[in-house]
Amino acid sequence: MVQRGSKVRILRKESYWYQEIGTVASIDQSGIKYPVIVRFEKVNYSNVNSNNFSLDEVVEVEPPPSKKKA
């Protein structure tokens, strides 16, 4: 399951970041078409390092780091 902090691979072929791995910044629960905001290490042609994707366009490759109890 994709959640905040997960590492995901992009499956949208027309995307600049196709097959790249990024980190999920947030997931919108309001019902919009592209609810998953993903941040990347590199920037695209417009110097942007994030983009919105649908849940079908991302696949989780690594779960988020678990929170350590104090």
From Swiss-Prot:
Q: List, alphabetically, the GO terms of the cellular component aspect.
A: cyanelle thylakoid membrane; photosystem I reaction center
Q: What processes in GO biological process is this protein linked to? A: photosynthesis
Topological relation to the membrane, as annotated: Peripheral membrane protein
Intracellular or extracellular location(s) = Plastid, Cyanelle thylakoid membrane
Note the Pfam families from the entry: PSI_PsaE
Task: Name the UniProt key words of this record, in alphabetical order.
Answer: Cyanelle, Membrane, Photosynthesis, Photosystem I, Plastid, Thylakoid
Give the InterPro entries listed for this entry: Elect_transpt_acc-like_dom_sf (IPR008990), PSI_PsaE (IPR003375)
Recorded superkingdom = Eukaryota
Record's PANTHER family? PHOTOSYSTEM I REACTION CENTER SUBUNIT IV A, CHLOROPLASTIC-RELATED (PTHR34549), PHOTOSYSTEM I SUBUNIT IV (PTHR34549:SF2)
According to its UniProt entry, what is the function of this protein? Stabilizes the interaction between PsaC and the PSI core, assists the docking of the ferredoxin to PSI and interacts with ferredoxin-NADP oxidoreductase.
Q: Which family does it belong to?
A: Belongs to the PsaE family.
**What's this protein's name?**
Photosystem I reaction center subunit IV
Q: Which organism is it from?
A: Cyanophora paradoxa
